[in-house]
Structures are given as structure tokens and as C-alpha cells.
């Protein structure tokens, strides 16, 4: 029996001699991956643009230096007879398996770069070694080099992965600090809060999601990807104008973008799965999964910005500030019998439950550099999966720039990205906000093939 206390004073899991126990969500992810070995259980990856072109040997040497500095990067899944699986750091890696080159075709364009990133994001990450990879996407014609980082969701959640990226490419002193992910939950569990959480989850997950016409036609040949970038301060200014958070701005923008992108097929609300951090302060220095999922009905029909924000904020309010709502949700999530745990993972990926899947990781603090080459942009790559019909969106970025990455089972992801950015700009105008002209900060990576 676990020793987690009702007031949350003790961590639910931690680093122990002989290895780190899997959190319940880690185990659900593992069970899902084992049940469906050809379906990737991946965190949204990151495509890093750089000012410079380090070669494969240079990147491998730089990564090895960081692995020696941060042995947690050598954690691998170990299963021994009679014992539950654990993460154990063995102190070394085979760098040729973890840092690999993926040459782009001759004459490669941005479309080829996106296609390669999407293809790699749909590959299963092996669990017989540390569950991450640094891929160099090289262009023989231009000499350009991009890095695609991807990892298994069995090992980390999105916030933990931000920390892993800092271990590998961030300032070494900052990476070694034990501040951990920024979104900690300090609230206390109470009997009343647990009852409210049970009711909230039952209500939130009741009934199907509305459908979008763009997702119900014949399956597309692969997925398309798109990105939109904007200054974080602009998102904050919009949120302040409407009494909302950056996450609310993100979701309201998604609702408007989807309404312009595709018509609904029924009268049901179009819902998105939203991941919410449930990480305790005692877990700040530990990797692994510490989140819960809820559903949010997106405002596709309401025309007034105030009405749209009211609808979203009403649903996200329980999880804001020092609330213990996500910890209360996690209390119940952690108690799902293991034989049913993988169903909770698969259910959130079903179109009938949610047409959209959204995550907000926040920008990586930065600065980052790969073998001395400064990283100029970090673009989330939501994982593609054959047969998955949802729109998958991740808000991340680097430093003061937020970037939303879109993976869509249709050839129109870049259009959706443009529409999301246009929605944010429309919310600015409605609030009387005039942002400073900065084309670099408000750049949209366009998909020329979709024009």
C-alpha cells in the first residue's frame, strides 16, 4: 500500500536507492505501449532551429558531456522477476543509438522538413534503452541542420521533457538547479475536495464530443503539420484584458480557429482533452508523469469575445492558482486498477471522446545551444499516429516566444495554425490592444503546399 497522506505531505513517488519507481501514470503509459507495441506513446517532440551547423560527431560529443553531467539521462526501464518495473540509471549510453542523423532529400524544402519531423514523431521509442533520441535533420544542399528531440511518454511528461531539454542543451548551472518544472501544485487534499473531484470528472467525461467535418472524411495519407509563433507577452496582455490566463487565451483561440477551419457535423459541443499538471513540490526534481486530463468544451459558436472567455474560464477555473483540484483528480486517477489504466490513456485519443487534444507546456526558459550552435526557435511536434483522427496541438516555444504546433490527420494543419494566430490578433483588436510591430515574434511558419 502506498503511504501518500490525505494532506499531500508525502510524495506519491520518488527516487529511491536501486532505482525510481514508476508513477501510476508511468505504469498506465507502459501498459498501453505494451498492449499496442506499434502505436507510439510519445510526448510532443521539439524541432530546434539553430544558428550554425554542427556535425554528427560534434553533437554526439556534446551530448555525451551532458550525459556525464546529468546521469538521469541514462535512466532505462528495468524489469526483474518478482519486482515492479523501475527506472534505473546505469551511467552510460550508446551515443550512436541516441544521436542519429536523418538526411533530408536533395533540394529539400520546409515541406520536406515538416514531413520528416512528422514521420519520426510517429515512430515508437524503444524502451530497451534510455527512452529519448536526438535526431539531426541535415540538408545536403544548404548545409542547414535542425535537431528533432523526441522521447517516450512512459518516461516523462511534457514538463519533465522541458527539463530534459535543458539538461541536454541549456545552461549547465541552471539545468543543475533543483527548481524543476514551474507548474507545481501546493494545495492540500481534503475529503470535500476529493468528493468534488469525483463529481467533476464524472461530469466532464460524460457524453461524446461533437464532430468536425474535416476529421470525418476518408483518412488522409499521413498527417500534416503547422506552427504559429507569437510573443508570450502578447498572450498575457490578451488574458489580462479578459481576466483570463494564457492557457485560456490559447483555448479560446483554438475554438475560433476550428470554427473557421471546419464546420461541425452536429449540435454537440466540440471538446478537447486538456492535460493539467498535478506535480507536487516534493516531485520537482523527479522526472516522470505527474498530470491529469480533463475535457473542455471549446467555444465555436459564440461570437462575443467576452462570452467565449466566460465559457472557457468557467471550465478551467478549478485548476487555477493554488487550487488542489488537479491533485484531487490525481488521487482518483492513481487508484484506477492497473488492468484498466491503459484504457484511460486510449480513451483520451478517441475521436468520439474529443475532436481535439491540447497541451500547454509553456516555453522552455532557454537559452539553448547544440554543440555551441545557438538555438533560435523551438517548435513543438505533436506526435502523429496512424489511425488517430484528432487534431493534436501543443503550445510551447523558447524564451519569450510561444509557438503552437499542430498535427492534423488532414492536409490543412498550416491553415489551422494561421487561423489560430488570426484569432489571437482578433482578440487583441477587440480588447483595444495594439501590439508592437514585430514580424519575427509573430511569424507563422506557413505550409506552402496547403495554399
State where each predicted segment sits:
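Soluble acyl-CoA-dependent acyltransferase catalytic core bearing the H(X)4D motif
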Residues: 2-27, 36-389, 396, 400-401, ...
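Conserved donor-binding loop and adjoining core beta-sheet/short helix segment
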Residues: 30
Amino acid at each position: 500500500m502506498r503511504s501518500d497522506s490525505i494532506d499531500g505531505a508525502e510524495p506519491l513517488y520518488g527516487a529511491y536507492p536501486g532505482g525510481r519507481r514508476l508513477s501510476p501514470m508511468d505504469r498506465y503509459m507502459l501498459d498501453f505501449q505494451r498492449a499496442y507495441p506499434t502505436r507510439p506513446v510519445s510526448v510532443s517532440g521539439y524541432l530546434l532551429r539553430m544558428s550554425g551547423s554542427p556535425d554528427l560527431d560534434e553533437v554526439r560529443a556534446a551530448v555525451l558531456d551532458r550525459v556525464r553531467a546529468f546521469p538521469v539521462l541514462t535512466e532505462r526501464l528495468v524489469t526483474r522477476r518478482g519486482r515492479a518495473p523501475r527506472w534505473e540509471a546505469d551511467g552510460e549510453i550508446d551515443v550512436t543509438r541516441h544521436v542519429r542523423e536523418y538526411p533530408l532529400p536533395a533540394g529539400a524544402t520546409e515541406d520536406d522538413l515538416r514531413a520528416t519531423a512528422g514521420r519520426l514523431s510517429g515512430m515508437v521509442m524503444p524502451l530497451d534503452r534510455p527512452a529519448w533520441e536526438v535526431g539531426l535533420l541535415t540538408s545536403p544542399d544548404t548545409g542547414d541542420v535542425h535537431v528533432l528531440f523526441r522521447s517516450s511518454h512512459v518516461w516523462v511528461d511534457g514538463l519533465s521533457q522541458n527539463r530534459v531539454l535543458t539538461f541536454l542543451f541549456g545552461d549547465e548551472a541552471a539545468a543543475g538547479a533543483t527548481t524543476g518544472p514551474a507548474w507545481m501544485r501546493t494545495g492540500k487534499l481534503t475529503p470535500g475536495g476529493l468528493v468534488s473531484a469525483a463529481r467533476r470528472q464524472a461530469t466532464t467525461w460524460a457524453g461524446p464530443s461533437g464532430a468536425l467535418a474535416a476529421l470525418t472524411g476518408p483518412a488522409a495519407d499521413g498527417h500534416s503539420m503547422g506552427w504559429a509563433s507569437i510573443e508570450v507577452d502578447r498572450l498575457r496582455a490578451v488574458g489580462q484584458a479578459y481576466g483570463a490566463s494564457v492557457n485560456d487565451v490559447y483555448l479560446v483561440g483554438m475554438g475560433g480557429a476550428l470554427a473557421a477551419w471546419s464546420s461541425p457535423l452536429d449540435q454537440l459541443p466540440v471538446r478537447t482533452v486538456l492535460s493539467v499538471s498535478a506535480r507536487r513540490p516534493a516531485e520537482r526534481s523527479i522526472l516522470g508523469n505527474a498530470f491529469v486530463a480533463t475535457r473542455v468544451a471549446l467555444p465555436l459558436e459564440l461570437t462575443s469575445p467576452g462570452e467565449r472567455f466566460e465559457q472557457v474560464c468557467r471550465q478551467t477555473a478549478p485548476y487555477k492558482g493554488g487550487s488542489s483540484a488537479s491533485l484531487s483528480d490525481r488521487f482518483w486517477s492513481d487508484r484506477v486498477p492497473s488492468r484498466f489504466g491503459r484504457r484511460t490513456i486510449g480513451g483520451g485519443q478517441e475521436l468520439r471522446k474529443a475532436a481535439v487534444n491540447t497541451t500547454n507546456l509553456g516555453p522552455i526558459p532557454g537559452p539553448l545551444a547544440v554543440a555551441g550552435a545557438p538555438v533560435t526557435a523551438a517548435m513543438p511536434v505533436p506526435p502523429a499516429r496512424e489511425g488517430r483522427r484528432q487534431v493534436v496541438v501543443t503550445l510551447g516555444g523558447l524564451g519569450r516566444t510561444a509557438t503552437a504546433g499542430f498535427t492534423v490527420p488532414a492536409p490543412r494543419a498550416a491553415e489551422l495554425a494561421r487561423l489560430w494566430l488570426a484569432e489571437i490578433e482578433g482578440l487583441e483588436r477587440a480588447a483595444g490592444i495594439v501590439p508592437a510591430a514585430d514580424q519575427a515574434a509573430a511569424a507563422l511558419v506557413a505550409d506552402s503546399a496547403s495554399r
